């Protein structure tokens, strides 16, 4: 109900102010930007809490069908797995036979069973040129502790599976159950801008639910006795002496994938050495 207040200029009637007084209603596009930003923050805070495991990808080498450079070609690889993007160093003057021997450690989100790989030619004075690409399905037997060493066909300007091949060595490590947290639904509330206050939730408007991960503390996991011997520096050095042509990080990755089993690691490294 309106009230009357006396001022120097006379009586003034003051009524109830509407709920949207001095508020700027955002457009649908602005609301979507806010929701996307909140979802991105939740994903960032969540980190690897919702991951199913860790995938190790060793990008060894590639045999390309054509040199697309004017004088030389400097290829590098880009891998997209889930929301993450990884890159190898540039193989300077690698041309049609680039070698990287780069080990990439990826966290695998639940439900993700493949990744996308692209090869680019690094350019100095123009945009990097995409040479080849392929879609790789993560082998099921990786979860059994095996190491997969395969050549995958590349697609490109020459046609599907006609741009050459790339050699990848993959292993998988499962994250202990005590270190994983189930993702919880996150409520994303539509907001409006209120002058002097900022963005505030809109009363009476239902929130949108997003299956993100909320920031939370990691539970203290009880120490578990290791079932296999850890990778010792002596074993690593011995394997490095046996395979001097292989990169040290590649040997370390294979040894870790075999859970410190030196004999099994030697068999896997012998298969890799035969391909080189």
Swiss-Prot record:
The free-text domain remark for this protein reads: Both ATG8-interaction motifs (AIM1 and AIM2) are required for the association with ATG8 family proteins. The N-terminal TOM1-binding domain (residues 1-53) is a disordered domain that partially folds when bound to the GAT domain of TOM1.
Return the similarity comment: Belongs to the tollip family.
Q: Which residue ranges does the record assign to the C2 domain?
A: 35-152
Protein name per Swiss-Prot or TrEMBL? Toll-interacting protein
Binding partners and assembly: Oligomerizes. Interacts with ATG8 family proteins (via AIM motifs), and ubiquitin (via CUE domain). Found in a complex with TOM1; interacts (via N-terminus) with TOM1 (via GAT domain); the interactions leads to TOM1-recruitment to endosomes and inhibition of TOLLIP binding to PtdIns(3)P.
> Domain of life of the organism in this record?
Eukaryota
For this chain the motif AIM1 maps to 133-136
Give the organism the record lists: Danio rerio (Zebrafish)
């Amino acid at each position: 109900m309106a009230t009357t207040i006396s001022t120097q200029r006379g009586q003034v009637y003051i009524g109830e102010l509407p709920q949207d007084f001095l508020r700027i209603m955002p457009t649908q596009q602005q609301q979507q930007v806010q929701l996307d930003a909140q979802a991105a923050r939740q994903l960032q805070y969540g980190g690897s809490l919702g991951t199913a495991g860790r995938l190790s990808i060793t990008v060894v080498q590639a045999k390309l069908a054509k040199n697309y450079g004017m004088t030389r070609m400097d290829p590098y690889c880009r891998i997209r797995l889930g929301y993450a993007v990884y890159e190898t160093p540039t193989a300077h003057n690698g041309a049609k036979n680039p070698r990287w021997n780069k080990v990439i450690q990826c966290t695998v989100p639940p439900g993700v069973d493949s990744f996308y790989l692209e090869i680019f030619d690094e350019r100095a004075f123009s945009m990097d040129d995409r040479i080849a690409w392929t879609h790789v399905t993560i082998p099921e037997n990786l979860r059994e502790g095996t190491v997969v060493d395969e050549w995958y066909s590349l697609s490109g300007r020459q046609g599907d599976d006609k741009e050459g091949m790339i050699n990848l060595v993959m292993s998988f490590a499962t994250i202990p159950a005590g270190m994983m947290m189930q993702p919880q639904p996150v409520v994303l509330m539509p907001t409006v801008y209120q002058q002097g206050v900022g963005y505030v939730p809109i009363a009476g408007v239902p929130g949108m639910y997003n299956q993100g991960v909320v920031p939370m503390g990691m539970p203290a996991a009880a120490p578990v006795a290791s079932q296999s011997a850890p990778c010792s520096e002596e074993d690593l050095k011995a394997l490095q002496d046996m395979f001097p042509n292989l990169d040290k990080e590649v040997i370390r990755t294979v040894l870790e994938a075999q859970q410190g089993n030196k004999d099994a690691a030697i068999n896997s490294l012998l298969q890799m050495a035969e391909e080189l």
